[in-house]
Regions:
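Active-site entrance/lid segments in N-terminal catalytic domains of soluble metabolic enzymes
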Residues: 1-205
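Conserved active-site-proximal phosphate/metal-binding subdomains
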Residues: 13, 173-211, 217-359
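Residue-level detector of alpha-helix initiation sites
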Residues: 21, 216-217
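Short, surface-exposed recognition loops or helix-turn segments adjacent to catalytic cores
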Residues: 127, 212-213
Length: 359
């Protein structure tokens, strides 16, 4: 699979997962094993392995404000540590369009050594503006419709740029969805039904590789989407079930213990439905006993400094940060719809073999 000038041995992208689920260990090992490892740029101020020379200003154990939550120095150290594992193999960063300081974080990732930038959670109409000084960095938006791809390609004409690849994410993915709540369950929005129009649209703009995401689990799924005309797939949740995944062991236990009915869609301060495991947090929100929303990190623009968080009953930065630390009581545990299928922890090497050779 080729993205921009980068050749990836296997047609598998490990999806970005934040806070702290896909950092140096997971992304580094996926790239080492021939996939594309993706470092999440969200919440880097929480990184547990910071060197003493990086100073993160904390308030109540949480990174204070945007500069600390999206720490440039921490992101650089995460990339450096991943490079110790995968050397010069392609490595990507996932940066949500909805974050505060999007442009700055894109530049930070380029400076840190990202070869590819992947962006979802919004339509990144001005993404190329922030990579002008990094012409070798490949740009990959995530879309949920042909219409969104068309809009991006039109807007990018002013930069004389088309996407180096496009990821089409269906409504079975973990975390935020590009669909209204009720549309997540409709036949017409299933990944296999939205992918073909995107492939057709991509042909109108040149040879843009199309990558399928959302509910991909095994080699059978990968083969199916490649037969539909995709260049590859992006999958995230299954990589949580690896030793190398940067998540706390207690985070992995939440998925190991989850049943199919525990994985649900929920409201999010970002204003989109989000999929995760129903844990104590959801019950405490219903009972009004969840941790108080204080907006310490100011993480995402749509939340409007905690306004939306107060409406839905939780702060997404704080709760994802808690999950990264292994706090099962107050953490938010995002998962794709297949997360309950994780039944044991294996190595990235073994998982990549299952995905490429079958199991």
């Amino acid at each position: 699979m080729k993205i921009g000038k980068y050749e990836i041995k296997h047609p598998i992208i490990q999806g970005g997962m934040g806070v702290g689920i896909s950092w140096d260990q997971l992304a580094g090992h996926v790239s080492l094993e021939g996939g594309l490892g993706v470092i999440s740029a969200v919440g880097t101020g929480y990184y547990k392995k910071l060197s003493p020379k990086v100073n993160i200003v904390m308030k109540k154990d949480k990174p204070k404000e945007v500069l600390n939550f999206y720490s440039k120095d921490a992101l650089k150290e995460i990339f450096d540590n991943a490079r110790k594992i995968c050397g010069n193999l392609p490595l990507a960063a996932n940066i949500l369009y909805a974050i505060n300081d999007y442009g700055r974080v894109v530049r930070d990732a380029c400076e840190a050594g990202a070869n590819i930038i992947i962006t979802g959670a919004g339509i990144p109409t001005n993404m190329p503006e922030f990579t002008k000084d990094f012409p070798d960095v490949a740009l990959v938006p995530i879309v949920s419709s042909a219409r969104a791809l068309k809009l991006i390609c039109k807007k990018w004409q002013r930069y004389n740029k088309i996407p180096d690849a496009v990821i089409v994410e269906g409504p079975l993915s973990g975390g935020h969805q590009g669909f209204k709540y009720e549309d997540c369950y409709k036949e017409e929005f299933k990944l296999e039904n939205i992918i073909t129009p995107v492939i057709e649209e991509a042909k109108n703009w040149g040879n843009i590789p199309v990558i399928a995401a959302g509910g991909i689990w095994d080699k059978k799924d990968i083969d199916k989407f490649i037969s539909l005309g995709c260049a590859g797939v992006q999958m995230a949740t299954r990589f949580i079930g690896t030793f190398e995944c940067d998540a706390d062991p207690k985070f992995k236990d939440v998925l190991l213990n989850a049943k199919e009915e525990d994985i649900v869609l929920m409201s999010s301060p970002v204003g989109l439905p989000a999929r995760g495991v129903k844990t104590n947090l959801q019950f405490s929100i219903e009972n009004h006993t969840a941790p108080k929303v204080q907006c310490i990190s100011n993480c995402v623009a749509p939340c409007n400094r905690g306004t939306e968080a107060k409406i839905v009953g939780y702060c997404i930065a704080d709760r994802l940060g808690a999950a990264y630390k292994g706090d099962v009581e107050t953490g938010l545990f995002f998962s794709g719809s297949n997360g309950y299928k994780i039944d044991k922890i294996i190595s990235v090497k073994e998982l990549m073999e299952k995905l490429t050779k079958g199991e």
